[in-house]
Every structure is written in structure tokens, then in C-alpha cells.
Amino acid sequence: NVDISLFIHDLPGKSDTTAFSTADASGSTSQAANVIEGMESGTGLFLIDEDTSATNFMVRDELMQRVFADSEDPITPVISRVRDLYEKLEISSILVAGSSGSYFHVADTVIQMKEYVPYDITERAKAIAAEFPPFTASVRPFALPSFQRHPLPDKVLTGSDRTKVKVMGQESILVNKSLTDLRAVEQLTDSEQLSGLAALLLEAAERAMDGKKTLIQVVDLLEKEMDEKGLLALLAPGRPGNLARPRRQEIFACLNRCRNLKFR
């Protein structure tokens, strides 16, 4: 139930991209959901590596824009939204790229890595880019995504007298029969963080996810508990010990990847 309409619209089959759910996301829809997840978590910066991004989600060159009208392409690429993200929401972006000079037109700063040494080449890059005025097709108006997602109570997480928790390294957590795959959350660095996420998932299920609170409110409540009581707030029979506190962004990542959770 993620609103990815800022980037994805008019999908085949009339899928509603303002409340999008799928079990087989493409590279572009997956990355769109990831960006929206970051926005929902309150991030102020996106770090994007071109090598691990969906090309059609990042940029459309002039020829592609001329051949296919915006109305014929379901994707509004990042390059068409990156200035809006910064100017309207104060969200910066750092992109590692080497495939397209189109990014020079929207970048504030251009840094070249030469033999592992960074050089600021903004002035030169902008001067050369000015010789190649960008062709800009019409882009849908910027509209802030809806973050009114309300996680519903989950019996798999709370319906057992004996809670079983298994932390599988830095890859996933299993709570009762609910598996949360965190392999793609690369910023997690140790199993203690996953233990913390498992405890937070249980805390959210038992005390916060009632179908009335939004996901943002649920995470706010979890962070408030940890701010006031530390990780002791998460200790309870059946829950893992040896915890490390994850960041707000990782809590959102965990809750969004728990396949058992349903939202309204």
C-alpha cells in the first residue's frame, strides 16, 4: 500500500500506484518504493549508486523522450524529480554516476574521482553542459505522496503464547512464522541491530499497530520509548537480548519488509 505515484503511474493492468502492492516488483517499482520509504522516514539525503539502480528509473535520454511521450511511459525518472525533492522538501541527493551527462544540468556540484582523489569540476561541467541544452518533455506536476498508511494488528506476530524469535546474521529475522528479509538493507552492519529490529517489531505489534496509528506514528512511539528508557524498553520474555539500536530508517525498512503486515 505504498504511494509511488510521484515516480510511477498508469501501469499496465490499471494498478493503483497511489496504494501499490506487488509480490514481483520490477527494478523501477522497487526503487520507487525504496525512495518513498526514505521520504516517509524523514530522510534529508539519498545516496544513490548508478550501478545498483534501475536505469529507466534514473534517467531518460533525449531520443527516448522524443520517441515516447510522457503519457506513454509509466515512469517519471529521478532526474526529473531531483530538483523538486531538494527545493520543495529539502531532500538532497548524492549520485555516483558515469553513464549520462544529463545529470550535469540538475546537479549543484559535480565531483570527479581521479585516481581516488576528488576534484570539484562543477564550473567546467556546467560550462560544457550549457553547450548541450536539455530536451525536456512535459512532466507530471509534483505532488507529495500520501503517508497515511495504518498497519493493522497481526495475529502471527502476537497470537502465540510462546514467542519464537530467530535472527539469521545480517540477513533476516523470523518472528514466530513471519519472515522479514533484510538482505537488501545494506546499512545494517551487525546481527545485534537485527536483534533490535526483531524486538521493535514485536513491540510495535503488541503496543502500537492497532489500525488507527499511521506507520509514522508507530515509529515515533517506538523511538520515544527508546529515548526515554533505552533498549531496556524492548526487553521482555521471548524477545532477543544483546541488542543494538537501529536508526529510524532501518525501523521503517524492517516494518515495510515484514510480509505479514497489512495496511489500510
Regions found by a protein language model. Give the residues of each.
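Hydrophobic alpha-helical scaffolding
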Residues: 21-28, 68-75, 89, 93-97, ...
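Short C-terminal domain-edge/linker segments immediately following a structured domain
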Residues: 19-27, 77-80, 124-128, 140-144
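Conserved alpha-helical scaffold flanking the Walker A/P-loop in AAA+ ATPase domains
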Residues: 26-39
